[in-house]
Amino acid sequence: MRLSRYFLPILKENPKEAEIVSHRLMLRSGMIRQQSAGIYSWLPIGLKVLNKVCTIIREEQNRAGANEILMPTIQSADLWRESGRYDAYGKEMLRIQDRQEREMLFGPTNEEMVTDIFRSYVRSYKDLPLNLYHIQWKFRDEVRPRFGVMRSREFLMKDAYSFDLDYEGAKMAYYRMFVSYLRTFARVGLQAIPMRADTGPIGGDLSHEFIILAETGESQVYCDRAYLDLAVPGADTDFRNDAQLTDIVTRWTTPYAATDEMHDEADWAKVKPESQVSARGIEVGHIFHFGTKYSEPMGAKVQGPDGKEHLVSMGSYGIGPSRLVAAAIEASHDDAGIIWPKAIAPFGAGIVNMKPGDEGCDGVSEKLYEALTNAGVDPLLDDKDERPGAKFATMDLIGLPTQVIVGPRGVAAGEVEVKDRKTGERQSLGIEAAINMLTAQA
């Protein structure tokens, strides 16, 4: 993409309404625009990041055996009355009527609807286990939306729901999602720690929040430093191997880790003082097992191997992709702007033409652009006629992992300068060497 043809509305000043780093940088770098309280449009560069996050989430959900569906945002109030949650939810749930005066709602979550889908089609234990997921925009009317997309009223969510014959099956479904989440966050470039957590209004008896440590985190968390050195499950993880999954979950739940709500001072005291980490954290995922909380009132049953009907045991697994984008910025930035992990960077590299109109600079920039594009690097070429300082500031702000600087002096020497955004290190390379290095990293 050429910057001269790209919609990138950069803000020079820090927005007054932005309280935290991610909100400020997302507005300044032209990722989002606020349309009303807690509701945002995603602009081209922000949407590219969001789509990359969703792609990783999809790949890992599919790898774990989940099936993608898409449920509607508008739900019937009757389903929620079946589960007993319609009156339990407060004003955060947007309630509406259609022209026939039927009561509807803008779904804040989808347990009822997915249970209705399941009970309509699945009759036998032979069709289990089953995990259905979707990625959908949701709305919760927060009393005080703040922190940009970190706590907004409209947000994107990946919800997965598992259905099993009994508790043992449901526990393994939970373990599959647990391991899938570890891999998902690692691929996004974040170090997430699973912590014991309250089940909240969804309910249940087994629950973990996945937390990344960040100074601006909204939650106080406590964990053993051992988590920082644990190896994330690799791509060769066999999600059909219950023993392997159990071993991974055991390793990732044995050291102490808990949110403030579940913190136990007696257990915390058993952790060596030098291993205690007390910090702020951001929730990026939450998984629950809630058994028959929804299958019982809604009659979701299957015939078991004994010929009898059994209520299915269920779990719910959520990741907020839009929130995850903000969390990645909170975890990786500096005074100049965002520092994107390579996996979710909007572009693979930025090419900075220091002197558009100069035959040499234009020629080298075009050569780099064509070679990197053909190699799948997806570069952003800054071909705008601006002063060098503004070009460098823009590139640092939007946080592309690598910058290739093309200037008259370097071109005359047959070289370009390659800058690593994270480390700030610069090196002069021959043009072909720079192309080879960047394509090898693609």
Curated annotation (Swiss-Prot):
Biological process, per Gene Ontology: prolyl-tRNA aminoacylation
GO (cellular component) term, any one: cytosol
Keyword line: Aminoacyl-tRNA synthetase, ATP-binding, Cytoplasm, Ligase, Nucleotide-binding, Protein biosynthesis
Catalytic activity: tRNA(Pro) + L-proline + ATP = L-prolyl-tRNA(Pro) + AMP + diphosphate
Domain of life from the UniProt record: Bacteria
UniProt-annotated location(s): Cytoplasm
Any GO molecular function: proline-tRNA ligase activity
EC number assigned by the record: 6.1.1.15
Record function comment: Catalyzes the attachment of proline to tRNA(Pro) in a two-step reaction: proline is first activated by ATP to form Pro-AMP and then transferred to the acceptor end of tRNA(Pro).
Xref: HAMAP family: Pro_tRNA_synth_type2
Recorded family membership: Belongs to the class-II aminoacyl-tRNA synthetase family. ProS type 2 subfamily.
Known partners and oligomeric status: Homodimer.
Name of this chain's protein: Proline--tRNA ligase
Organism expressing this protein natively: Brucella suis (strain ATCC 23445 / NCTC 10510)
Upper classification of the organism: Bacteria, Pseudomonadati, Pseudomonadota, Alphaproteobacteria, Hyphomicrobiales
Gene, per the UniProt record: proS
